[in-house]
Structures are given as C-alpha cells and as structure tokens.
UniProtKB/Swiss-Prot annotation:
Family membership: Belongs to the UPF0523 family.
InterPro entries assigned to the protein according to its UniProt record, in alphabetical order: NTF2-like_dom_sf
Protein name (Swiss-Prot/TrEMBL): UPF0523 protein B
Amino acid sequence: MENNKKLTLCEIPNAFIQFFNNKDYENKSKLFNNTETDQWWVSGDKNVYPFAGSDSIQKRLDGFQTLQNGYDKYSMTLIDQIIDHERRIMLVVGKTVSMGFGMTKEYSNEYAFIISVNEDGKICAIKEYFDPSAYLKMAQSTPSLQGIFKNFFPDSFAPTSRD
C-alpha cells in the first residue's frame, strides 16, 4: 500500500486485519488518522477488566504490540464485515489465535470492531467487543502476562482465581 493512496471503505477491513498480522506498527499512519487523540473503546466493566473503556488508539496499539512481540504464534482472520458507506462506519468481525509467553494452551477469541472512517479513508474511532473474561483468564493463568498487565494497568490489575 502506497503512503498517499487513500483506502476505500471496502479495503479497510482487510487492511485492518493485515496491519496486525504483519505487525506493521511503523506504518500506522497509512491506516489510522491520529493515534494520539483518536479513541479506541473496549467493552467490559473497568472495575473487573482493567483494559475496558476508552483510551487513545496509540495506547491500544502499544499494548497490542507488546503482546504480539511475546507470541510465538499469532493470527487474526477476517470472518465477516458490514460496511455503511453513507455513515462511513463498518463492523469487522475477526478471530484471533495466539500462543506464547509460556501459555499451556492456545488462546482464541472472536472480536467485533465497529470502525469509523474519516473522509481521508483513515480509521478515526474504534469500538471493540469480545469476551473479556476469556482474555483475563488466559492472562491470569500465565505468569509472564501478569507482569505485562501490571505494567499497563499498575493500579487495577490483581490476579484472582476466577473461573
């Protein structure tokens, strides 16, 4: 993808998935509008799931990159997409599979992203829905991930024995 090529709405879902599969963080400006000010909201109760709520897209990308760097195996697959051309929003459904950090079994989860795109063809807001309890269980059962969580959420992450 060329730097100045404007993505069409139909190209964005696959570009979003491939951005993470290719770990293309250095070229984030090709896909995202302003990662410092634009927001990425994640579902869940922040009192239970410290990663829930709104943060800058950049903070979400930083956390994701840290996780990806520790995975021995990672993939995200596009499952479905719905695009509203008039409102410039889309629903992107993907499935991730990952293994690493000394995990004893593979982690897999489905994610639904509602993505807003500006007139320049750049992602300017994201809402993410998934099963946060599956993610938290995986993190709490993996000691090296507990350390990463404590770095990103120092005041709110405390391992528990939830089932």
